[in-house]
Amino acid sequence: MDVAALVSGGVDSSVVVHRLCEEGYKPAIFYIRIGMEDEDGYIDCPAEEDIELTTLIARRYGCPFEVVDLHKEYWERVVSYTVETVRRGLTPNPDMMCNKLIKFGCFEERWGYQFDRIATGHYATTDLLNGKTYLSTAKDPVKDQTDFLAQINFAQISKLMFPIGHLLKSEVRAIANAAGLPSAKRKDSQGICFLGKIDYNDFIERYLGKKEGRIIELETGKVIGRHQGYWFHTIGQRKGLGLSGGPWFVVKKDIKRNIILVSRGYDPDTQYGKTIEMETFDFITEDAYEAGYWNREDATPVTFKIRHTPEFTRGLLYKGEKGYRLESEERIQGIAPGQYCVIYDEDHHLCYGSGMITKGR
């Protein structure tokens, strides 16, 4: 079986190569270059260090290694999506789009199709049910990345291998140390993948600029501060508002008037909601309604996430003529339109897919 391994130079993907070789595979190693650089060299991404470490791994295990450049595709499909989503006052998820469109999209179209399986360092697993592959959660609940993979499709999940998904992060580190891998002591990457060392707000300012507006207390209608543009703020945001007497939370945005509405939380109804609406929902393996597993006339008990945290929330999923509605068992803070709601089974093991949030209340 021919296997391609997507390697970043970090400890997780390095251990992937180590384990594949231990199991008798000789994977072809690929490093995807996606770091952004405009005409001014604005974006600083540590690609050279990544490539150097990946080269060492490839040499050690005698694996073929290729650097593939998807810079242009990444700009056109992921970075532009991020900027446009923010411009519309919504909350983007560029990491989710990167997996769907770049790592398992463009790469598959140009290189991956030559291989039987694609291995990555994601913390996730798969299960085979009724002859079909399902995305499943990882052993490590803190590192689990299924929410970032919840927009991929059946063709993509069917080819994927997650060699470290059944390990805790501490176990991955221990394997790397025992094997003497060059990335064993390397820190985990943080933040959005294309930004490198660049601050997110600096990036947004570069492409959307600044526009001063009012910060208004929702309950009283009083102007209590100024902001530099609604696009710098997301629903549920607590830090970076520059207000005293808090904590303050962003609860609404008036896009047309460039107004940020905030609350200190003494009225929980302004901050928390139980209803999530989605116009569409993308199943990874198969549509559970069409397959007959779920009945559109009944509520389906599920667990879900609306942000990258170890915790799952219970709820009931409904399918109607105009889309999908999720009723949460408990009130949740910061339901942000544009973000994705990721749906799991009741045991938060199988990940069914995700839908973009259009409204929360």
UniProtKB/Swiss-Prot annotation:
Annotated site residues (Interaction with tRNA) in this chain: 122, 339
Pfam families: tRNA_Me_trans (PF03054), tRNA_Me_trans_C (PF20258), tRNA_Me_trans_M (PF20259)
Intracellular or extracellular location(s): Cytoplasm
Protein name: tRNA-specific 2-thiouridylase MnmA
Keywords recorded for this protein, A-Z: ATP-binding, Cytoplasm, Disulfide bond, Nucleotide-binding, RNA-binding, Transferase, tRNA processing, tRNA-binding
A GO BP annotation: tRNA modification
InterPro entries referenced in this protein's UniProt entry, alphabetically: MnmA-like, MnmA-like_C, MnmA-like_central, MnmA-like_central_sf, Rossmann-like_a/b/a_fold, tRNA_2-thiouridylase_MnmA
One GO CC annotation: cytoplasm
Keyword Cell inner membrane (UniProt): no
Lineage: Bacteria, Pseudomonadati, Bacteroidota, Bacteroidia, Bacteroidales
Cystine residue pairs: 98-193
NCBIfam families membership: PRK00143.1, trmU
Catalytic activity: S-sulfanyl-L-cysteinyl-[protein] + uridine(34) in tRNA + AH2 + ATP = 2-thiouridine(34) in tRNA + L-cysteinyl-[protein] + A + AMP + diphosphate + H(+)
Active-site residues from the entry: 98 (nucleophile), 193 (cysteine persulfide intermediate)
Family: Belongs to the MnmA/TRMU family.
Enzyme Commission number(s) from the entry: 2.8.1.13
Binding site for ATP: 6-13, 32, 121
Main location: cytoplasm
Region (Interaction with target base in tRNA): 93-95
Function: Catalyzes the 2-thiolation of uridine at the wobble position (U34) of tRNA, leading to the formation of s(2)U34.
Keyword NAD found: no
PANTHER family the UniProt entry points to: PTHR43052, TRNA-5-TAURINOMETHYLURIDINE 2-SULFURTRANSFERASE
Top class in the EC scheme: transferase
